[in-house]
Regions:
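Mixed-charge, low-complexity intrinsically disordered regions
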Residues: 1-74, 80-138
Length: 138
């Protein structure tokens, strides 16, 4: 497994991020990414405006971390969209991998955004499509 320092040196300009908001969800998401079932993700747009997170940049390679902070995957951003929560569709939900359908996505993301104090039916979301560039191992 590559250290985070080595991964960031290899992919200059990369941003390191933790998929998910718990250890269990992080492990599930990394497994879905590795399997190829997860090629998209989203979050509230405001976290990129307020500096909580770094907005993905098309073409940039970023480093997905496991819950312990170790480099797990290098991902390349293919597309970034701004879309309202209530305009999310089945196509984008399917790319996220962890949801059965749009209704399941809405339940999951409403709970997640509510926990973070960011939910509104029309909240702007960032939707990213990505590909795996390198798997640093489990």
């Amino acid at each position: 497994m590559m250290t985070l320092v080595a991964a960031l040196a290899k992919y200059e300009g990369a941003f390191a991020y933790h998929p998910g908001d718990s250890a269990a969800l992080n492990a599930e998401i990394l497994a879905l990414m590795r399997s190829g079932l997860k090629t998209g993700t989203c979050d509230a747009w405001v976290i990129y405006v307020d500096g909580t997170e770094e907005l993905p940049v098309v073409g940039r390679v970023d480093i997905a971390l496991d819950w312990a902070g170790r480099a797990a995957l290098a991902t390349r951003t293919l597309a970034v969209e701004r879309i309202a929560f209530d305009e999310m569709d089945e196509m984008r939900v399917a790319q996220q991998g962890e949801f059965r359908d749009l209704a399941h996505w809405r339940l999951g993301y409403e709970a997640y955004l509510t926990r973070a104090g960011r939910f509104a039916p029309d909240v702007d979301m960032m939707f990213e499509r990505f590909e795996i560039v390198e798997d640093f191992g489990q």
